[in-house]
């Protein structure tokens, strides 16, 4: 049997209003690409992965962690499938808003509620509550005088502080500002609080998430 190239796997899902840059974040982080004025042609559930190194606080060792990052986009039928299957069992959730779009910030509460109403803990996803991380994208446009819907960044910071949700509000996927930091911070938070079983132990768990996580359970490598 081939040796695994990672010790743990974390599932992370991207959610937020349309046009906030979720798909571009996925491409920037996993592929190092950003297409100026690009058109999102893919409709459905897009999954990319990346292996990073994190510190295991309990053993003080550096471990390799494979991030499986899920992004749902497209029409209503894809969104319903996404909500039904991909908000239920994940290790972490990145909720994005656009700092130039006040409505996308105002909708953060709706996204938080949707996730909390869908999330279920399990052997593979041990956190009793969903682990959330809020991201404000397009900070490169914050000084653009042509944009009249800029979010006062004090408000999202106060909002996140009131809910004890970690966040980064000065992100630019276009300019590659704080992109890596998002995933590094969220992944480390998961590993420090409710880490999943090691990959080598997953197959030893019997009857894991029976009936509720058929899609995610098949992705264990």
Swiss-Prot record:
Q: Which residues form the propeptide?
A: 219-221
Which Cys-Cys disulfides exist here? none
Which residues are annotated with the lipid modification S-geranylgeranyl cysteine? 218
Residues binding GTP, per UniProt? 16-23, 71-75, 137-140
What is this protein called in UniProt? Answer: Ras-related protein RabS
Q: Where is it located? A: Cell membrane
Q: Which PROSITE patterns match?
A: RAB
Q: Which organism is it from?
A: Dictyostelium discoideum
Q: Which UniProt keywords apply?
A: Cell membrane, GTP-binding, Lipoprotein, Membrane, Methylation, Nucleotide-binding, Prenylation
The processes (GO biological process) annotated in the record are: hypotonic response; intracellular protein transport; regulation of endocytic recycling; regulation of secretion of lysosomal enzymes; response to osmotic stress
Sample GO molecular function, one term: GTP binding
Q: How is this protein positioned relative to the membrane?
A: Lipid-anchor
Q: Name the protein family.
A: Belongs to the small GTPase superfamily. Rab family.
Return the motif ranges for Effector region. Answer: 38-47
Cellular component, GO, one term: endomembrane system
Query: Organism's domain of life?
Result: Eukaryota
On this chain, the residues bearing Cysteine methyl ester are: 218
